[in-house]
Curated annotation (Swiss-Prot):
Pfam families: Phe_tRNA-synt_N, tRNA-synt_2d. HAMAP family: Phe_tRNA_synth_alpha1 (MF_00281). It comes from Bartonella tribocorum (strain CIP 105476 / IBS 506). The keyword Cytoplasm applies. This is Phenylalanine--tRNA ligase alpha subunit. Keywords: Aminoacyl-tRNA synthetase, ATP-binding, Cytoplasm, Ligase, Magnesium, Metal-binding, Nucleotide-binding, Protein biosynthesis. Its cofactor is Mg(2+). The gene is pheS. InterPro entries: aa-tRNA-synth_II (IPR006195), aa-tRNA-synth_II/BPL/LPL (IPR045864), Phe-tRNA-synth_IIc_asu (IPR004529), Phe-tRNA_ligase_II_N (IPR004188), Phe_tRNA_ligase_alpha1_bac (IPR022911), Phenylalanyl-tRNA_Synthase (IPR002319), tRNA-bd_arm (IPR010978). It is found in: Cytoplasm. Mg(2+) binds at E260. Transmembrane segments: none annotated. Its EC number is 6.1.1.20. GO terms for molecular function: ATP binding; magnesium ion binding; phenylalanine-tRNA ligase activity; tRNA binding. It is an enzyme of class 6 (ligase).
């Protein structure tokens, strides 16, 4: 065995024995560093005769290249092994229970929870979910819903308007979710049964009002629906949502441009204590507004009011959340206070009483 072969064998054994990047780098320096074994032999080429140099040069350079290649392969192997070790130490078992510290566990916001409860109740009764844009046109927000230009009912809405755009149109933030009723009626054929939860915007702010609030509206359009059906629907919803066996309701005459007749619905309750109790007591609390869809609204979407009829209603999601779960100030809903959310929020698997197997 020649000196070159013996040197290559020694270096290869040292590379194989290196078990971390620091040891591997030491082998490289010992072989190819400024005073390394291969570097010293390469320096000696200058002292050789030309004939000897022509023979030894390619051999030494070949050795250098082979050692560099083996070193790079071992370096990559050690890096992969180090990464595998790190990943195995940092693996998170997603089947483990969540941490118990209040600041480390997430909570579902009451608004999100109540929206899910509302959707669950109405979909169980055959309704589908509809959605629409928050930024609306004057036509969908007012005109199509029987609010003509200059109509005094427009004063009921303190509206956020945008600047007039390039085509002369002035967009606005929707003041109710009713525009989705028009958009749905334009696209779908009757019969229609939809609910529309979403954000709405009005210039109002106090303990019970917010410039942005959540509303759910519903719409039923067919050839046979009556006020009796509407009254049954509201009674059923209130019993399910407030989790009571029975409720007393009263329907008071009111006015909404898009319904005729229009009504406001009160639910009987007990307000004598620190919280509102439904299904008992002698007090009354307004819960929603409703009515039969106005013939002008039906005509605006191409339906014959002599053939089709239906009813619509709307209620504030924030308001009924406050009533059901005893939250006194609406403004706290939007303060991003984790302490408030930890107190009033819901765990991921919390379910209301009207769901079967709620404790599973």
């Amino acid at each position: 065995m020649s000196d070159i072969e013996r040197l290559e064998q020694e270096i290869c054994l040292a590379l194989e024995a290196a078990n971390d990047e620091q040891a591997l780098e030491a082998v490289r320096i010992a072989a190819l560093g400024k005073k390394g074994s291969i570097s010293e032999k390469l320096k000696a080429l200058g002292k050789m005769e030309a004939s000897e140099r022509q023979k030894a040069g390619p051999v030494l350079n070949g050795l250098k290249n082979r050692i560099l290649e083996l070193w790079a392969q071992k370096r990559d192997l050690l890096k992969r092994q180090a990464m595998d070790t790190r990943l195995s130490r940092e693996t998170v078992d997603i089947t483990l229970p969540v941490r118990s510290s209040p600041m480390e566990r997430g909570r579902i916001h009451p608004i999100s929870q109540v929206i899910e409860e509302i959707i669950a109740i109405y979909t169980k009764m055959g309704f589908s979910l509809a959605e629409g844009p928050d930024i609306e046109t004057d036509y969908y927000n007012f005109t199509a819903l029987n609010f003509p230009e200059g109509h005094p009912a427009r004063e009921m809405h303190d509206t956020f308007f945008f600047d007039v755009d390039k085509i002369g149109e002035r967009k606005l933030l929707r003041t109710h979710t009713s525009p989705v009723q028009i958009r749905t009626l334009e696209k779908q054929k009757a019969p229609i049964r939809i609910i529309i939860p979403g954000k709405t915007y009005r210039m109002d702010s106090d303990a019970t009002h917010s410039p942005m609030f959540h509303q759910v509206e519903g719409l039923v359009i067919d050839k046979t629906s009556t006020i009796a059906h509407m009254m049954w629907l509201h009674e059923t919803f209130c019993k399910e949502f407030f989790e009571v066996a029975s409720v007393k309701m009263r329907f008071r005459p009111s006015f909404f441009p898009f319904t005729e007749p229009s009504m406001e619905v009160d639910i009987q309750c007990d307000r004598s204590g620190s919280e509102v109790k439904f299904g008992e007591g002698q007090d009354w609390l307004e819960i929603l507004g409703c009515g039969m869809v106005h013939p002008h609204v039906l005509k605006n979407v191409g339906l014959d009011p002599d053939e089709y009829q239906g009813f619509a209603w709307g209620m504030g999601i924030d308001r009924i959340a406050m009533l059901k779960y005893g939250m006194p100030d609406l403004r706290a809903f939007f303060d991003a206070d984790l302490r408030w959310l930890d107190h009033y929020g819901f765990r991921c698997f919390d379910m209301p009483a009207f769901f079967p197997n709620r404790n599973v």
